[in-house]
Amino acid sequence: MEDLSKTDIRSLVRRSYGEIAADNAEGGDCCQDSLRIKSSAQEISRGIGYSDIEILNAPADANMGLGCGNPQLIAELQADETVIDLGSGGGFDCFLAAEKVGPRGYVIGIDMTPEMVSRARLLSKKHEFRNVDFRLGEIENLPVADNTADVIISNCVINLSPEKQRVYDEVYRVLKKGGRIAISDVVLVKELTETMKQDEKIYCG
């Protein structure tokens, strides 16, 4: 059997996360060998480094427990900064970032799944976030102008991309000079077996 194409992988990921958003389902820690653990999203978030204050400050429906760490811990976000979140999902990290950068700061969430973007936009409107913008797009081709961001964050998303170098090329393009990145993700430390390469669930986190 041939390896899955880049298009196939994107389609699988888009469908998988679209179903999660549409079903209002809770996910699982993507670092758990691709098994969806049954804990609540809040418990998952607490276990991967989010404080109780962060969990309570963000809209509850934005937190689906899909991350594998807390990029906010290393982002050191400052007032008035512009932040881009790669693979923003329901908007959990974006809403936290919006509070930290304040009313004169700005947060842009990028996600390729229409259902996730719709969910995040509804939550943003419901909770009256005025400094957050959710955009539909692929992280390999960001719908953002050059030299836009002071900080780029991402939580367990880049591993889902079949073209990781393109992602980092885009990061470099949209970052301002002196900008920084804060990424929580999983990495491959040894070659996957042929059986694993054909397992669609692995490509979906």
Where are these regions (language model features)?
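Conserved SAM-binding strand-loop segment of SAM-dependent methyltransferases
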Residues: 127-140
